[in-house]
């Protein structure tokens, strides 16, 4: 992969900022190849060719539709299950499907150790406690770190029955055209487009890269600043060290805006470990940087059962 491939990946979100809302990378299905081309300096045809290549390589195998748990009156918590033997991770990802309320899991490696991060719903305290106990039983070491709250921007509107129907169609057909969605819910394309845009804009739902996609060769670099350090000055220094820097949005990593003051985070290429190590050392030498931590994504899995059951119940009862 080259810098243009990474730039295209970055601008799958129109603002060029990366978000992970308890899932894989959030993308905007409305972003066109032409809009990406304007950001990365290629022709529209060139962007389309690059997207096809990334898809053929397995990095962009498709999208999934995620529904905001807040529309069901729930929130998300995250816990970490330590992994000592690499062979323990694949069966654990499969077994997590047995735990009601688990929606996503990611196998990660960071400066400290390897773990599977498990994202699950928090609806009532007893339910959260029960799910955490089940995770402990599945954990290869019998240990679970957490859970801790994982903040996602709440949905800003009340959904109508038509909204729920469009959300169902969009979840069933995450890559369908607006005309296809309109046909599925028996409304005009204009109505379907308007409603879908409202659902996306109010964060009732979003698109994410499919969990069948290969992990991009990227590392999450989390940087803690010293007290009094100026973030913009540090960012300018980072740009000279990491030519490819995909900033994580303030609302994109599970912390509410304003709660992570003094922390900068972004994705950087990890194809060359020695180059990444050198970049981290140079990052630590920046005036105002207290620490820097790398996290690598090794794999992930989605678990749709809880969301699908909640959505079916809403469709049965919506007026």
Feature map (PLM): residue ranges:
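A compositional/biophysical signature of low hydrophobicity enriched in polar/charged and small residues
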Residues: 1-319
